[in-house]
Amino acid sequence: MLKRREPDMFKRVLLKLSGEFLAGDNGFGISPETTAELARRIIGALDGTEVELAVVIGGGNLWRGARNGQGMDPATADYIGMLGTVMNAMALQDAMEAAGKPTRIMSAIHMQQVAEPYIRRRAMRHLEKGRVVIFGGGNGAPFFTTDTTSTLRALEIGADVVLMAKNAVDGVYDSDPRKNPDAKRYEQLTHMDVVEQRLEVMDATALTLCMDKGLPIVVFDIFEEGNLARLLRGERVGTLIQSRG
């Protein structure tokens, strides 16, 4: 039987965001208004807590290697996508700092004019000082998704959990709830449940790393007002995935 997390359990979290969250109604590019609203939600959730927050953001609003990179060298297409994540990190940093929250971007691909190089201990120090750390540039190597980067960075910085943010999907279902009105939502699962049932949570490399290291995952709808704040307080939101307790 799984043990559900208790309130105030989370001290340090890794929030995984889709780059498409920044696109707004256009579905592509960066909408300053949408990005500002996302920043507001994140900052509002942190207010009044001592939770340390790191963020990994994808680049799908700017580039998708499988679609945009057809005919290209696969590694080159992936590197273009990684550069896109730094662009998104800069947009999110700008929105968060405009709202008064100190942030730092750390990139696995060196570009010192816009981001600090990723150094694990420096990232942890920023978090201890109350800064939000946004990781860009993937993990610096092609052929890995930002899901895998999220898991890797979470383990490196000692995060308690990976929060997989979704839009209009409030957890993990046994089938696509947008296509099947009778789809069942899970409150909690084990990592092995996700593997055996082939549930779409994150890519296999990222999920295996979470399972091997016992890193919990919470899948939730970040655009449902108050969800992130409730999560950071330890309340039940979305679907919890963890090792068998």
Curated annotation (Swiss-Prot):
**Protein's GO biological process:** 'de novo' CTP biosynthetic process; UDP biosynthetic process
Enumerate the Pfam families for this protein: AA_kinase
Q: Which InterPro entries match?
A: AceGlu_kinase-like_sf, Asp/Glu/Uridylate_kinase, Uridylate_kinase, Uridylate_kinase_bac
Q: Which UniProt keywords apply?
A: Allosteric enzyme, ATP-binding, Cytoplasm, Kinase, Nucleotide-binding, Pyrimidine biosynthesis, Transferase
Q: What class of enzyme is it?
A: transferase
Q: Which reaction does it catalyse?
A: UMP + ATP = UDP + ADP
Q: Where is this region: Involved in allosteric activation by GTP?
A: 24-29
Q: Where does UMP bind?
A: G59, D78, N139, G140, A141, P142, F143, F144, T145, T146
Q: How is its activity regulated?
A: Allosterically activated by GTP. Inhibited by UTP.
Transmembrane parts of this sequence: none
**What's a GO cellular component annotated to this UniProt protein?**
cytoplasm
Gene Ontology MF, one: ATP binding
| Primary location recorded for the protein, binned into one broad class | cytoplasm
Q: What is its EC number?
A: 2.7.4.22
Binding of ATP occurs at: K16, L17, S18, G19, G60, R64, N167, Y173, D176
Q: Where in the cell is it found?
A: Cytoplasm
The pathway it acts in is:
Pyrimidine metabolism; CTP biosynthesis via de novo pathway; UDP from UMP (UMPK route): step 1/1
Tell me the HAMAP family matching this sequence: PyrH_B (MF_01220_B)
Q: Oligomeric state and partners? A: Homohexamer.
Q: What does this protein do?
A: Catalyzes the reversible phosphorylation of UMP to UDP.
Which family is annotated?
Belongs to the UMP kinase family.
What is this protein identified as? Uridylate kinase
What is the gene called?
Answer: pyrH
